[in-house]
């Protein structure tokens, strides 16, 4: 982008000043080819950038004198945006998966739910275990506590219990998270 382009005020523009936005009298200049040009006055550096048809972009404002590079500002912003998008893609949102049990859940169903729970934890998600009581089962809450203890024992040391089993209305709730890998 040549020097005559207008500056659009965005939060990103505040990070890297360019051309006339640079206010310091002397800057260390890196050429468009990546070679060190040296310490020049701001006006000399701007003239050199204009001569090449590029922008003078402040790369390290905290340095003494600040480091500026002669480059195409639009291309520079595009590359920064691309890097930010790549970093954003690599981060994974932790989801909370919910599995519902009953105090009298059959062995086959229990094993399937346990296998799913292991898979969710391996993927890095948290699991909310919900043990529901129906009718007179509420008078046998110890069965729910035994079920929660069995789940904890079957999953082994690969987990962190974020919240111990607690009664919420007619259901017992427990939160399980995967253990952080070092």
UniProtKB/Swiss-Prot annotation:
Query: What's the protein called, per UniProt?
Result: Translation initiation factor IF-3
Protein's cellular compartments:
Cytoplasm
Give the organism, scientific name.
Xanthomonas axonopodis pv. citri (strain 306)
Q: Where does the record place the region Disordered?
A: 1-22
Q: Which InterPro entries match?
A: T_IF-3_C_sf (IPR036788), T_IF-3_N_sf (IPR036787), Translation_initiation_fac3_CS (IPR019813), Translation_initiation_fac_3 (IPR001288), Translation_initiation_fac_3_C (IPR019815), Translation_initiation_fac_3_N (IPR019814)
Q: How does it assemble?
A: Monomer.
SUPFAM superfamilies in alphabetical order: Translation initiation factor IF3, C-terminal domain, Translation initiation factor IF3, N-terminal domain
Q: What is the lineage of its organism?
A: Bacteria, Pseudomonadati, Pseudomonadota, Gammaproteobacteria, Lysobacterales
Superkingdom of the source species = Bacteria
What GO annotations for molecular function exist for this entry? ribosome binding; translation initiation factor activity
What this chain does, per the entry, is described as:
IF-3 binds to the 30S ribosomal subunit and shifts the equilibrium between 70S ribosomes and their 50S and 30S subunits in favor of the free subunits, thus enhancing the availability of 30S subunits on which protein synthesis initiation begins.
Family (UniProt) = Belongs to the IF-3 family.
| Classification via NCBIfam families | infC
Q: Keywords in UniProt for this one? A: Cytoplasm, Initiation factor, Protein biosynthesis
Q: Does the keyword Magnesium apply?
A: no
